[in-house]
Amino acid sequence: QKVAVRLKEVVYTLSPHQQN
Protein backbone atom coordinates (compact mmCIF):
# COMPACT_ATOMS: atom_id res chain seq x y z
CA GLN A 1 0.00 0.00 0.00
CA LYS A 2 2.74 2.41 0.97
CA VAL A 3 4.60 1.56 -2.22
CA ALA A 4 1.52 2.41 -4.26
CA VAL A 5 1.19 5.77 -2.53
CA ARG A 6 4.88 6.47 -3.05
CA LEU A 7 4.59 5.50 -6.70
CA LYS A 8 1.51 7.66 -7.12
CA GLU A 9 3.34 10.57 -5.54
CA VAL A 10 6.34 10.11 -7.82
CA VAL A 11 4.16 9.76 -10.89
CA TYR A 12 2.22 12.85 -9.89
CA THR A 13 5.40 14.80 -9.30
CA LEU A 14 6.80 13.67 -12.65
CA SER A 15 3.48 14.32 -14.34
CA PRO A 16 3.52 17.43 -16.55
CA HIS A 17 -0.06 18.30 -15.68
CA GLN A 18 1.07 19.41 -12.23
CA GLN A 19 0.14 22.81 -10.82
CA ASN A 20 3.51 24.24 -11.81
UniProtKB/Swiss-Prot annotation:
Pfam families: Cyt_b-c1_8. It is found in: Mitochondrion inner membrane. GO terms for cellular component: mitochondrial inner membrane; respiratory chain complex. It comes from the Eukaryota. Keywords: Electron transport, Membrane, Mitochondrion, Mitochondrion inner membrane, Respiratory chain, Transport. It is a single-pass membrane protein. Component of the ubiquinol-cytochrome c oxidoreductase, a multisubunit transmembrane complex that is part of the mitochondrial electron transport chain which drives oxidative phosphorylation. Belongs to the UQCRQ/QCR8 family. Component of the ubiquinol-cytochrome c oxidoreductase (cytochrome b-c1 complex, complex III, CIII), a multisubunit enzyme composed of 3 respiratory subunits cytochrome b, cytochrome c1 and Rieske protein, 2 core protein subunits, and additional low-molecular weight protein subunits. The complex exists as an obligatory dimer and forms supercomplexes (SCs) in the inner mitochondrial membrane with cytochrome c oxidase (complex IV, CIV). This is Cytochrome b-c1 complex subunit 8. It comes from Equisetum arvense (Field horsetail).
